[in-house]
Amino acid sequence: MYKELTKYKSTNHFSFTPEDQLETQCNATEGSGVFLVYECKGEEKQLIMVGSTGTVQNDGTLKSKNGGLFDKIVNGHQFAKTGRKYSWPSQMKLEKIEALEVHWFETFGGKLKVIPTYVEGQILQNYLNEFGSLPKWNVAF
């Protein structure tokens, strides 16, 4: 796990296969934060995507889309102009990915107010430093 994520207490993870329904497997909250997607092959896990949700406004308040992390993971668009609940299973079959493990972290709430895209950027920068590229499902940042 990335050290930037150890301070967040509202966190969990879930597994997902192409046969599962993402909306029933996803246990993320409606809070704002980041999520990391790992490709699982046996005991090995490889980070393949980092995402976030929630925008901090000029006055320091958070603008969050309805549904927060849960909605971003399940209904956010990726690979097509359609929600991940449809595109992830298709992409997993195409790439012969057996399972995904999704870890999510609320970064903005209560006393802790860390901008979700800042945390996303930190993790992506660390990945870039280590591997020389972004995770394969991150198109750009």
PLM feature spans:
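Boundary/linker segments flanking structured domains
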Residues: 1-48, 52-141
